[in-house]
Amino acid sequence: MNPKYPIYIISKGRWESRLTARSLDKINVPYHIVVEPQEYDLYCKSLGKHRVLKLPFANLGLGSYPARNFCWEHAKALGYKYHFLFDDNIQNFAKWINGKRKKWTEIKTALLYVEQNANKTNVDILGFEEFIAY
């Protein structure tokens, strides 16, 4: 099962670590990694040109919002109503089981669950919770 909607990973300065991309590669889930022009070649060497989208701007000083908006517009231009958007620093996926957070390797199931709920509820934004353990 491949996701019904495109997956984007926004990234800057992490062409070597590529944590989220590696997680998705392990389970053969297709994605695009979205980067600024000055890092495009570095990401292409790491991931292959077919996976890398080059932003039409660089160093705007506005955080990740312009890149997120680019992904939204890119997905809409391809005819998608929804898309997945991930940061580039996800090491693991987890879910709550009996009140405890457990590592979850069934990422495809999680994507399918979100897709089904988006289609069923017709909400504009639906996604995953970020959890950082300190």
Which residues does each predicted region cover?
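N-proximal low-complexity "stem/linker" segments adjacent to membrane-targeting elements
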Residues: M1-K26
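Soluble or luminal CAZymes and related metallo-dependent hydrolases
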Residues: E16, G63-A67, T105-Y113
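Short amphipathic alpha-helical segments and helix-helix/interface helices
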Residues: T20-L24, C44, W72, L111-E115
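Conserved catalytic core of nucleotide-sugar-dependent glycosyltransferases
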Residues: F93-Y134
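Conserved acidic residues
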Residues: Y5, K81, D124
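Active-site-proximal specificity loops/subdomain of glycosyltransferases
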Residues: V35-F86, Q91-W104
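Short, hydrophobic beta-strand segments that form beta-sheet elements in well-ordered domains
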Residues: I7-S11, V29-P37, L126-G127
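Structural alpha-beta junctions
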Residues: D25-H32, L47-L53, Y113-D124
